[in-house]
Structures are given as C-alpha cells and as structure tokens.
C-alpha cells in the first residue's frame, strides 16, 4: 500500500504501476540470487532495475514504502530499540556432546511416544543470532531478537538490510517464522582485519559479530556488513496445513525464505548420528560457522505430546561438535605495525596442532585485551580458532605460573621507526605509530598492492619489499612502476640479473591487470575484492570512481552509505590523487576494457573439488567471461558440474539429479569446441584470459 494521501492523485497511473512492477521484479531476482543461488539476469541488468526504481522514488517520494527494495541499503540512524513481546516464547535448546547422550535422548522420546522408531530432522546449528520475523499479507512488518525468550528487541530496520530476508513473500500470508542471522566467514575475517586496522577491538567469533552488527543504531553500517540468514521454523504450522518439520522447511523455501540446503530427514537416531559425524568433518567446507546439529522430532503431533520445559522443548536437542581448543605456551610477544599504524601484539607460541593445522602465532589484538585477560609471556594458554579460521588466545592458566612469567607492556615508541606512539582519541583502544612516514605502514600497503588478489607481482616478496622501503627506493605504492634494473641491483645479495629481469617483467605485466585488481590493491578501507569488482563494473575507470560523488556511490547495489563514505574520503586525500597521477604516467591501465566472449552464454555451471589450472575464484571469473552463469549449489537447472579432485556433496547431488559432469580437461575441450562453433580462436581466448587474470 503506497502512502501519500491527496498527492497520490497527482502521480501518473503508469508511474505507480511501473514502481510496483519494478519492486516485484527486483524482489523476485533477490529471491533467485540470495535464496535459490540461481540468478536469471546479469548484475548489470539487476543494477539497471534498481537504478530506475531509485530514480522514480526520488521523483515521487510519496511512493516510498517500508518494503521497497531501496530500503535495504540503510541510511537511518535509530534512537534505540523498543521491546516487543513474542507471540510464542523463543525457547533455548538443551545441549548434548556425545553419541551416548543423543541415544539417551532418543530413548526418552520413544518411551514417551510409545514408538519403536521416531523420524527426526537434522539441521546444521548455525553460530548466529536467533530472529523472529513477522509478515502481514505477505509484507515484512517486524524483526525481533530472542532477548530473554519472552521479550526481544525490535531490530526491523536492520533486518531490512539483509538481502536474503524477503520484504515481500511469494504468497500474501500473515505468518511468523524464526531462524538465524549470521555473518559469513569471509565477511567476519574482512571485518576483523578492518577493525584492527582502525584500532577497534576485533569480534571474538562470528556470532558476536552478527549480534553486535544487528544492534547497531546506524542502519547503513549494518548494510555494509553483509549479514545473511537461514529460516527453519514456522509459528503455528497447523494454520498452513503443515504436519511435519520437513514439510515446514519446504514450505518456507516456497514462500521465499532462505533455507539451509544441508538439512536431512532421518528415519532414526542412527541416521542422525551419521549426519553429525559427516558434518563434524565437513564443517570447514561451509562459508558460515556451525557448532553442531539441531535434532528435531519430525511430526508436529509428536512434538505436542512431548511438550517443553520452561526453558527448552523436549522434542529437540542441540548435538554439539567437540570444542576445538588446544593448550600451549607463550614464548614471546612481537609487535606488528599495520597499514594505518596500529600496533598489534602477536603471541609467539610453542607449535600446537589445532583444527587441522599447526599454530605457531596468535593475535593478542591490543594491549587492553591483554590486560583484561591477564596474559603474560611464559603463560600456558588456551588457543582456539575464531570462526574456525583465526587463531586467538581465549584465556591464560594462572594456576600453572612459576613466577618467571613477564608482563606484556605497551611500547613507548614504534618498534619499526622509533617514532611517537599514542591514540587518535581518548576512547580508542588501539595504540598507533603517529609517524606519517613510518616504513612499516608502507610495507603493509605494498604487500596488499602486490598480492595475488591485487596486482599479483610474485617476485616482490616480503624481503624485497622490506629492502626497497628501507633503502628509500620506494616511498609509495606507485613507485613500484618506476623501478630500474640499477635500483634493484642495489638491493644486495640474492638479487641477480635473472631475478631482476623476472621482477621487471612481472611489474610490466601488472600494468595490464583488470581494473578490479588495481582497486583491490589500493587498500581502500572497507573495499575488498567483491566491492572492487562492483566498482570496476559500474564505473569502468579509476578516474571515474575518484570523481564519483557520495550520492552516486551509495545508491549502487552492494555499496551503501558506509562504503561510499570511505571511498569518497580515500580519493579526497591529495596523496591519493598524486598516486593516481603517477600510476597513469607509468602506463598502468586505469580503465576496464575486458573482452567478453559468448562461448558459454545461456549455460549454468557449478564447480566442486580442487582444479589444477584454476583457483576457485579464477574458474568463476573464467566462466563468467565466457558468458556462463555460475551457481554455488547444484539444482535441476544446472547444466554442467565441473569436477576437480576431492569433490564435495555437489557431485553426489549432480548424479542424483542426472546433471552432466565433466573433468577439468573435458571442460577445456568443451570450451574449445564451443569456441570453434562460434567462430572464436580458443588460443586467443586463453591468451586473453591469462593477461586479464
């Protein structure tokens, strides 16, 4: 329903109809992309629809409604969160940690129900924040946190920014559903790196990151953090003719919600245990963090018989994975200087096996963290991987101290340049090097610039970068492109003529890298690879991005106000302008002129396993350059699955759905044959790809 009263009569009927059509179309494509993982239009076509809707809503602000897709980008600053009462209490779950206990749970269930076997639904337990979502006539009206289970906080404005949460359902239902809001692993890692660079304390785990984000008063900040969702529960399922949890999951997907694809219907508790064992080993394949399996009695009539306690249902239980912690000892603490000057203490550890890798170092984040946790050199400590990826010290073990342990004190000067250290503001946690010319800052910036994700200058490793900066040959990132054989020869032992020639050749090749790789290499705060690609696709040149206004940037899907502000501030800096000019004079490609071929146009691909000639990112880029659509999961709409070494569950699903599979070698032959049919030279395509990548 549009707002606007008397003014509505002045708006042309065709405009109202176009706005409604655009909203329906955009929500449909959001559903295809974020829920089904199966888009049917290009990003460019989607952006065009969104820009048109934004344009019409600006011309006719009376047409803006709370459920418009344009409201997802955030921009409001909230005064606080009001308390709301849940229609049905949001209970917690009892936990179990081993197979014996889950078998006991099954025995209790069967005894109460007087059944010989009970069917269960096993669902991955997402490490996120519980959420209740309400809809009236298919339109989103409320998002509330669990709170104490009886009352929660109204976080509707922040929930709107989450792309996988539909603002309109695919049916005009009045319904309440529940699920989990989570932060993907890559986003968690990016956010913590960014926070450490900015001198802020990192989040301990993805759940804390999601919870902290959902309670932000600035909705634009929430939008920039790319939260995601899985929905798994229907309140009053009998109102919709649902008799089992498994039916409810299919129903949720049909009406527009993102449902975890790995849930499984189990005939008995033994199948539940097999599922738990499988995902205990496979959990690192996922792009979100899971800490166990939720086991639910499938039939709703059985659930009613079993009932619940005041705290938890008797028909469900959390079957947790073993905690991944290890005990080790701190041998020393070193200080790293970040790109923005933040001094980060790093614990040097006795090597210890943890979650499949040997851990020798762990970030201590900042000196306030060290003080709060009472961590000392020589302490025995517990280490775990935050979000399954980042080693961090959870706690020290004071009981094992001998008296020889040493306190960890903040440095009085920068350990690299000897310059003054301090805080940018009294309430800042981080201590920084205040010297604007500190070589450590430049070294970190250069490592980002030449990394594989950016300009990929392999010959410029850490040691050579250190020598280039220490010798004064490189004073900013653009100076890389002005190096001469004579400059490199001055760097001392190990830099022979062949090495020099190789480095200079790689630097020359780096000038032709795609625009998004250059943008990534600049190290703009909040701009990673994904955002860099959006900018390159939209603007086509670095200079156009540099000239773009805040208003233009914030309206681009995938950018939003916070990232837009960061980009504008970065390019407003006179030093940035100087660097761009130097890059231009050196012959670095500042424009996107990527040639695309329609060799695989109209075909949908998925990929599983490890490939020989491509990383996962590269094969996706390659397929998209050839006109294919790439999806993360296999469905009946997938044309081909490319299978590498050690394939995952996609391979089994492809076989079950009779989706065609091909090895990497078969795929390349397939491309060669399709190229010939369309009149393209395969060798030219591959040469162009190598230059572009």
UniProtKB/Swiss-Prot annotation:
Transmembrane segments: none
Cofactor(s), by name: Mg(2+); Mn(2+)
Keywords from the named record: DNA damage, DNA repair, DNA replication, Ligase, Magnesium, Manganese, Metal-binding, NAD, Zinc
Chain ranges of the BRCT domain: 595-684
Catalytic reactions of this protein: NAD(+) + (deoxyribonucleotide)n-3'-hydroxyl + 5'-phospho-(deoxyribonucleotide)m = (deoxyribonucleotide)n+m + AMP + beta-nicotinamide D-nucleotide
Keyword DNA repair included in the entry's annotation: yes
SUPFAM superfamilies: BRCT domain, DNA ligase/mRNA capping enzyme, catalytic domain, Nucleic acid-binding proteins, RuvA domain 2-like
EC top class, as a word: ligase
Function: DNA ligase that catalyzes the formation of phosphodiester linkages between 5'-phosphoryl and 3'-hydroxyl groups in double-stranded DNA using NAD as a coenzyme and as the energy source for the reaction. It is essential for DNA replication and repair of damaged DNA.
Record protein name field: DNA ligase
Native source organism of the sequence: Thermotoga neapolitana (strain ATCC 49049 / DSM 4359 / NBRC 107923 / NS-E)
High-level lineage: Bacteria, Thermotogati, Thermotogota, Thermotogae, Thermotogales
GN (gene name): ligA
């Amino acid at each position: 329903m549009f707002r606007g009263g008397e003014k509505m009569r002045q708006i042309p009927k065709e405009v109202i109809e176009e706005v409604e059509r655009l909203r329906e179309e955009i929500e449909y494509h959001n559903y295809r992309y974020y829920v089904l993982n199966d888009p049917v239009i290009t990003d460019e076509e989607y952006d065009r629809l969104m820009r048109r809707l934004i344009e019409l809503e600006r011309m006719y602000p009376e047409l803006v409604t709370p459920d418009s897709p344009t409201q997802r980008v955030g921009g409001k600053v909230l005064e606080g969160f009001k308390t709301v009462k849940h229609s049905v209490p949001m209970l917690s779950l009892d936990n179990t940690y081993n197979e014996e206990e889950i078998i006991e749970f099954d025995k209790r269930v069967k005894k109460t129900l007087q059944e010989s076997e009970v069917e269960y639904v096993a669902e991955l337990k997402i490490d996120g924040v519980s959420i209740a979502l309400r809809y009236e006539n298919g339109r989103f009206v409320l998002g509330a946190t669990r709170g104490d289970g009886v009352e929660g906080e109204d976080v509707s404005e922040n929930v709107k920014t989450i792309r996988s949460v539909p603002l309109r359902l695919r049916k005009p239902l009045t319904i309440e559903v529940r699920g989990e809001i989570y932060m993907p692993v890559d986003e968690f890692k990016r956010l913590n790196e960014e926070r450490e660079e900015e001198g802020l304390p990192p989040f301990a785990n993805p759940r804390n990151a999601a919870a902290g984000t959902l309670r932000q008063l600035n909705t634009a900040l929430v939008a920039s953090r790319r939260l995601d969702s899985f929905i798994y529960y229907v309140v009053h399922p009998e109102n919709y003719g649902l008799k089992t949890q498994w039916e409810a999951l299919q129903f949720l997907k049909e009406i527009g919600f993102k449902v975890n694809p790995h849930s499984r219907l189990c005939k008995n508790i033994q199948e539940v245990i097999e599922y738990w064992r499988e995902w205990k080993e496979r959990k690192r394949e996922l792009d979100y963090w899971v800490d166990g399996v939720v086991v639910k009695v499938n039939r709703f009539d059985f659930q009613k018989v079993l009932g619940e306690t005041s705290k938890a249902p008797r028909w469900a239980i959390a079957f947790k994975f073993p905690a991944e912690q290890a005990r080790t000892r701190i041998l020393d603490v070193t200080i790293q200087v970040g790109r923005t000057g933040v001094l980060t203490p790093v614990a040097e550890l006795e090597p210890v096996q943890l979650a499949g890798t040997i851990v020798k170092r762990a970030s201590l984040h900042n000196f306030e963290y060290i003080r709060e946790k009472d961590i000392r050199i020589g302490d025995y400590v517990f280490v775990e991987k935050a979000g399954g990826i980042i080693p961090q010290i959870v706690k020290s073990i004071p009981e094992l101290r001998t008296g020889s342990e040493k306190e960890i004190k903040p440095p009085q000067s920068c350990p690299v340049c000897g310059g003054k250290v301090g805080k940018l503001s009294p309430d800042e946690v981080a201590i920084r090097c205040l010297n604007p010319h500190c070589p450590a800052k430049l070294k970190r910036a250069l490592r980002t610039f030449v990394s594989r994700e950016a300009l990929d200058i392999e010959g410029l490793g850490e040691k050579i970068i250190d020598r280039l900066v220490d010798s004064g040959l490189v004073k900013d990132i653009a100076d890389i492109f002005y190096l001469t054989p004579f400059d490199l020869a001055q760097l001392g032992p190990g830099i022979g003529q062949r090495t020099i020639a190789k480095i200079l050749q790689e630097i020359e090749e780096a000038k032709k890298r795609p625009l998004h790789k250059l943008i990534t290499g600049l190290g703009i705060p909040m701009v990673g690879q994904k955002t860099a690609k959006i900018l390159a696709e939209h603007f086509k040149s670095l200079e156009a991005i540099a000239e773009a206004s805040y208003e233009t940037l914030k309206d681009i899907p995938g950018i939003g106000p916070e990232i837009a502000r960061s980009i504008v501030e970065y390019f407003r800096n006179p030093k940035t302008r100087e660097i761009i000019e130097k890059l231009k004079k050196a012959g670095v490609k500042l424009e996107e002129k990527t040639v695309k071929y329609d060799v695989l146009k109209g075909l949908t691909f998925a990929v599983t396993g490890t490939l020989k000639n491509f990383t996962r990112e590269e094969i996706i880029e390659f397929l998209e350059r050839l006109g294919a659509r790439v999806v993360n999961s296999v469905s009946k709409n997938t044309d081909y699955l490319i299978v590498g070494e050690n394939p995952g569950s996609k391979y089994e699903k492809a076989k079950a759905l009779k989706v065609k599979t091909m090895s990497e070698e078969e795929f390349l032959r397939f491309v060669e044959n399709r190229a010939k049919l369309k009149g393209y030279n395969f060798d030219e395509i591959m040469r162009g790809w190598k230059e572009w990548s």
